[in-house]
Amino acid sequence: MAERFDVIVVGAGMAGNAAAYTLAKGGLKVLQIERGETPGSKNVQGAILYADAIEKIIPDFRDDAPLERHLIEQRVWVMDDASYGYHYRSEDFNKPPYNRYTIIRVHFDQWFNKKAREAGVLTICETRHDLLIEGGKVVGVRTDRQGGEVRADAVILADGVNSRLAVKAGFSRDQPENWALAVKEIHFLPQETMEARFNIGEEEAAIEMAGKIDAGMMGTGFLYTNKESITLGVGCMLSDFKQQKISPYELLDRMKTHPSIAPLIAGSDMKEYAAHLIPEGGYNAIPQVYGDGWMIAGDAPIRHGIHREGSNLAMTTGMLAAQTLVELRAADKPFSAANLAEYKKKLDDSFVMKDLKKYRRMPEIFHKNKQFFTTYPDLLSRAAQTLIRVDGVDKKTKEKEIKKSFIGLRSLFGLIGDAFKFWRAVE
């Protein structure tokens, strides 16, 4: 006879661990299945942890979580052959409790999963699986382990952007047109060297990059400082990589030679490389997130690319999915599609869907208007150089030169049209 659980959680990333932990704390019997060797071994992220999301799940997470540095400074670079940028630094973010941290995913995910196991979750890794569906209802999973079938009243799918189980079962579909591919490297440096280069103490700086760094494709680069390492990466739309005939590795190598980046990683020891698909379709690309005996959480349905958020959305969706099941079990209600619709209501009432809905037009606008990643970074960089250079030319003349260069690269009607498109995207 197949072993039975209240809930099976597929995946041991941010969403999967959040769901499993919340379920166990709610008194449910939980099995968590992970394909990788260990929790975190297949998980890749820019590695920023947002405290608000994890705090709702584990309030005292700061006591023992493997946190690298807390973030107090955000820099944005608009890149051409040189670079132009701005930064925001606030000492308010340097006062505990800190709001954002850099993390190493493999370390954090293992810690998070340990918390779930301590709460009562049974986690098994290196396990392949398929959904068990009977009469249109998900009733468990079939694994490649001895015993095969494992039954449950509900299954939460938190197995990533291209959720193999959801697609195979027909709950979702592959959407490569809405996927970005991010690649990153971890560069190790002595702590004192890093702190001197970035002018930081125990706190951290994050840098986001756009422009020539992405070869005119829809995407961004990023650099985050950890305790003794730098996370450096770039992500662009999968379709753009194909169209431009450039590999992610080539783009990352080009990024490392940029004069603004090369000095920051000089002398470092690159020990880790990873790649990851990221959903960038936004609100309009969200699939059905629940059905009879199943729910989807994490990267599979949701990510907020505009504000570079991911971990907080993943954890929140996992938590809300779990809370829905805990509440239904407490009310002695079945995990039917009609009852699991409460999960979608919780999502709609949360910041997750509200933010995604607000920016629902932006992915399509950016994808169809590449000038936001080519022409405008060049224009902004030229304008900054013109204004900053002291060469005996009066400011009024310089302003005329800037206006002329703008209209030279983009017509007046084009500028007005782009401004309207951008306004429509963020209104």
UniProtKB/Swiss-Prot annotation:
Cofactor(s) of this protein: FAD
GO molecular function term, any single one: oxidoreductase activity
GO biological process entries: nitrogen fixation
InterPro entries the UniProt entry points to: ETF-QO/FixC_UQ-bd (IPR049398), FAD/NAD-bd_sf (IPR036188), FAD/NAD-binding_dom (IPR023753), FixC-like (IPR039651)
Keywords: FAD, Flavoprotein, Nitrogen fixation, Oxidoreductase
A family per Pfam: ETFQO_UQ-bd
Keyword Protein biosynthesis: no
Sequence similarity: Belongs to the ETF-QO/FixC family.
Function: Could be required for the formation of a functional nitrogenase Fe protein. Probably accepts electrons from FixA/FixB and reduces a quinone.
Protein name: Protein FixC
Protein's organism: Azotobacter vinelandii
Taxon lineage: Bacteria, Pseudomonadati, Pseudomonadota, Gammaproteobacteria, Pseudomonadales
